Amino acid sequence: YQIRGLGAKRKVPDFDDLVFLGASMSRYPLEGYRETCNTSVILGDRFAKKPIKLDIPITIAGMSFGALGANAKEALGRGASAMGTSTTTGDGGMTQEERGSSKYLVYQLLPSRYGMNPDDLRKADAIEVVVGQGAKPGGGGMLLGQKINKRVAGMRTLPEGIDQRSACRHPDWTGPDDLEIKIQELREITNWEKPIYIKVGAARPYYDTTLAVKAGADVVVLDGMQGGTAATQDVFIEHVGIPTL
């Protein structure tokens, strides 16, 4: 089978297909020059001692160091901070550049466990347990050797220049009951301060969301199929999962 990155090339519904309901009588319009529209959102106040308050309900999803360079990760942190929102580490751990430039940084915990460091969990503002990605729900991935330079290899405890297969599921839990235990473990490591996200690839969103909430997640992240990935089977990218819309 063919391995490639990015998202689906086929035409799927996207955000350009959205239409919005305007205000009239049943919903009174605001005068923009003297009234404000509050777009802030609080994430994590269900259980976390330190929930995150974002100025806008739009965040930057995970893109790993290795797929992106240190300058790009720093730029994402600066941009997110300027807009009052969060950015996400992606697979492979946390860089000093990204942490230093990000007001709110979400740390991803993936099945591969690449770069996983309890100290970095405590430095993050939230933790995102990645069960799956929209571009490959239920499937693993491939970290190409050409991306594994000396720094990436050191962060992920891998040999330089060798292709690495990423697991399709976490090695230490197999279902929602185990997930509840894992969430409790992460809360204890971080002194119950950090919001815990659960990220799933959009495939069975009703059931997956129900199980994630039941397991104790503060936030559920649904990743649509066109979200993209670093590398996986082409058939997954094109034909598995459902679009965000």
Give the location of each predicted region:
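Glycine-rich phosphate/ribose-binding loops and adjacent secondary-structure elements
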Residues: H170-L245
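Internal alpha/beta core interface subdomains
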Residues: A70, E74, M83, L143, ...
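C-terminal helical cap(s) of enzyme catalytic domains, especially alpha/beta-barrels
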Residues: E98, L105-V106, G145-V152, T229-T244
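Glycine- and acidic
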Residues: P57-M63, D163-H170, A230-I237
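Generic beta-strand/beta-sheet core signal
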Residues: A61, T88-G90, Q108, V130-G132, ...
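Conserved, well-structured core domains of diverse proteins
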Residues: Y1-I58, G62-S81, T85-S86, G93-M94, ...
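Glycine-/small-residue-rich beta-strand-loop submotif within the FAD-binding core of flavoenzymes
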Residues: Q108-Y114, A153-T157, I242
